[in-house]
Amino acid sequence: MKVKVAILGCSGRMGRNLIQAAHEHASIELVGGSVRTSSSFVDFDLGELAGIGAIGIKTSTTLAQLATADVFIDFTSIETTLENLTWCNENKKALVIGTTGFSDEQVQVIEQAGKTMSVILAPNTSVGVNLMFKLLQVTAKAIGDYTDIEIFEAHHRFKKDAPSGTAVKMGQVIADTLGRDLNKVAVYGREGITGERDRETIGFATVRAGDIVGEHTAFFADLGERLEITHKASSRMTFALGAMRAAFWLKDADAGFYDMQDVLGLKD
């Protein structure tokens, strides 16, 4: 049986990829997508919006118009996502969240919602990136206490948050594995005379340029050698296909707060 999916914020770069991925997925039935009431794409065909030709499904301006969906996929903004979370919880709908930049308090709100609804919070829905998280856990356990750890990320000029949600998640995975508090050991950029490096810190470096889809590298550096774990995305369709996989998995999930590690069966 196909899963009925609605795309929230479907007129953006990611939203258009999600439309195409959902329309072409054998196990997904695309039932609609939302845009803001002020959007120039109100009552617009989703297929035309995504550049794949008309598919006979028009954009909506409210979630209530998409109530036939089983699972909603949200790559909008922090404020909009939290509003959509409330609606989905009240209407017993599952939600895949790809929006990034949430504060710790906002993540707690999403986690709390997971007590009464099924929700996935995934700063990156790429299968490769989530395998990388697992590799980081293994690497940190083996050599994390003996190396200097730095995280580098690069994205397109239009990305609004920095460092990326994926980079923060990388740091969180490493810090948790090593028993460190990321809020205390994270260093976001360096300038001037910084002195010798504190061995327990985890550094973050950010690039915003051109049309870079997404690049992430974790460095585990010692004197004489270093290990680099890198993921590079060349197409947003990678994230869209991962989101479809998450939506299909979520349809049978009990109420809970999940991530892509659950979807891929990578949890210990």
UniProtKB/Swiss-Prot annotation:
Record protein name field: 4-hydroxy-tetrahydrodipicolinate reductase
Biological processes, Gene Ontology terms: diaminopimelate biosynthetic process; lysine biosynthetic process via diaminopimelate
Subcellular locations according to the entry: Cytoplasm
Enzyme Commission no: 1.17.1.8
Enzyme class: oxidoreductase
Stated role: Catalyzes the conversion of 4-hydroxy-tetrahydrodipicolinate (HTPA) to tetrahydrodipicolinate.
Source organism of this protein record: Colwellia psychrerythraea (strain 34H / ATCC BAA-681) (Vibrio psychroerythus)
Name of the encoding gene: dapB
NADP among keywords: yes
GO molecular function: 4-hydroxy-tetrahydrodipicolinate reductase; NAD binding; NADP binding; oxidoreductase activity, acting on CH or CH2 groups, NAD or NADP as acceptor
Positions that bind NADP(+): R36
HAMAP family: DapB
